[in-house]
UniProtKB/Swiss-Prot annotation:
It comes from the Bacteria. It is found in: Cytoplasm. InterPro entries: Dehydroquinate_synthase, DHQ_synth_AroB, DHQ_synth_fam, DHQS/DOIS_N, DHQS_C. This is 3-dehydroquinate synthase. It catalyses: 7-phospho-2-dehydro-3-deoxy-D-arabino-heptonate = 3-dehydroquinate + phosphate. Belongs to the sugar phosphate cyclases superfamily. Dehydroquinate synthase family. Coiled coil: none annotated. NAD(+) binds at residues 75-80, 109-113, 133-134, 146, 155, 173-176. SUPFAM superfamilies: Dehydroquinate synthase-like. Binds 1 divalent metal cation per subunit. Can use either Co(2+) or Zn(2+).
């Protein structure tokens, strides 16, 4: 078992990573130890994950003396919206839950983002715990306090920075994850190697097959390394005014794909993979990386069974209209996260639209 701390002064919290954590109530009891007898807890999940894991979590909570209930939501990125957010609010208000309620987000990135935002808003903020069940949420979205819902005009445009009290990662959950969802998570794993840790990228080139066979040691190492990097970055820049923006490699292009094609048609990690190729090609065109480095990035994403192409149905104008709504845009100027090597990246503001178009068009023939 691995344990990592996100250091944010009085808002610091632990990340526990290992196989079989759902079978051990100790991980929940550590978070709930200072709560009341008959502590009210709401577990919020979706219709896919709840039948697999909700009973285990509810059983552990009841063993700890908690008054626990379950809310099941629809499954899919297309449901990360204000309508479903209101369903959560209605459930909490109709149940007369007070400010001392603890909310548990049990699911992937959609559940974590939506439930985290609901926790930030309900009575101006209640405690919540992240229990991520997809690889993408385990290595990325459950850590760092970004919470949000989507708007038809842009992804994650309505949200807040709100940190959980703990993150509990049971790697056994990945045994029930469809391969397409697993691959989507690998896109974020590869991202960490590109932007921050060249040695980890090397390790991924050597050990990718072990991850796909769910080798326990390899999974625990990869998830822990991603969480360590995320924790280090968040501790330095919680609100994304500096280094944290590097975690958005591929996301400016990727969010445009998700918004234009409809949330859920491409998985988030798939869109990030395609966007990473476009960002890397932009770097190559600008002389920031070598041809060999570019080819290594594309080859690893391709080996991971991820899309490296540009969606055929999207024009340059389709990309730009969404990219100009990106949260990194300042004073009307588009800023892109661009790799400057294997293990480093920068936020760069002066890329011409001609270069961006070349990068987008490259992916049509890859």
């Amino acid at each position: 078992m691995e344990r990592i701390t996100v250091n944010l002064a009085e808002r610091s919290y632990p990340i526990s990573i290992g196989a079989g954590l759902f079978e051990d109530p100790a991980y929940l009891s550590q978070v709930l130890s200072n709560k009341n007898t008959n502590q009210k807890v709401v577990v919020i999940s979706n219709v896919t994950v709840a039948p697999l894991y909700a009973d285990k979590i509810l059983h552990q909570l009841k063993q700890l003396g908690c008054d626990a209930s379950l809310l099941e939501l629809p499954d899919g990125e297309q449901y990360k919206n204000l309508d479903v957010f209101n369903q959560v609010m209605n459930f909490l208000l109709e149940g007369s839950y007070a400010r001392d309620v603890v909310i548990i987000a049990l699911g992937g990135g959609v559940i974590g983002d939506l439930v985290g935002f609901a926790s930030a808003c309900y009575q101006r903020g209640v405690d919540f715990i992240q229990i991520p069940t997809t690889l993408l949420s385990q290595v990325d979205s459950s850590v760092g306090g970004k919470t949000a819902v989507n708007h038809p005009l842009g992804k994650n445009m309505i949200g807040a920075f709100y940190q959980p009290k703990a993150v509990i990662i049971d790697t056994n959950c990945l045994s029930t994850l469809p391969e397409r969802e697993f691959a989507a998570g690998i896109a974020e794993v590869i991202k960490y190697g590109i932007i921050y840790d060249g040695a980890f990228f090397d390790w991924l080139e050597e050990n990718l097959d072990r991850l796909y066979t769910l080798d326990e040691d390899a999974l625990t190492y990869a998830i822990a390394r991603c969480c360590q990097i995320k924790a280090e970055v968040v501790a330095q820049d919680e609100k994304e005014s500096g280094i944290r923006a590097l975690l958005n490699l591929g996301h400016t292009f990727g969010h445009a794909i998700e918004a234009e094609l409809g949330y859920g048609n491409w998985l988030h990690g798939e869109a990030v993979s395609s966007g990473t190729v476009m960002a890397a090609k932009t770097s190559l065109l600008r002389g920031l990386i070598s041809e060999e480095q570019f080819e290594r990035i594309v080859a690893l994403l391709r080996r991971a069974k991820l899309p490296v192409h540009t969606p055929d149905s999207m024009s340059f104008d389709d990309f730009i209209k969404h990219m100009m709504r990106d949260k990194k845009v300042l004073s009307g100027q588009l800023r892109l996260v661009l790799p400057t090597g294997i293990g480093s990246a920068e936020v760069i503001a002066d890329t011409s639209q001609e270069v961006i178009q070349q990068a987008i068009d490259f992916g049509r023939n890859i």
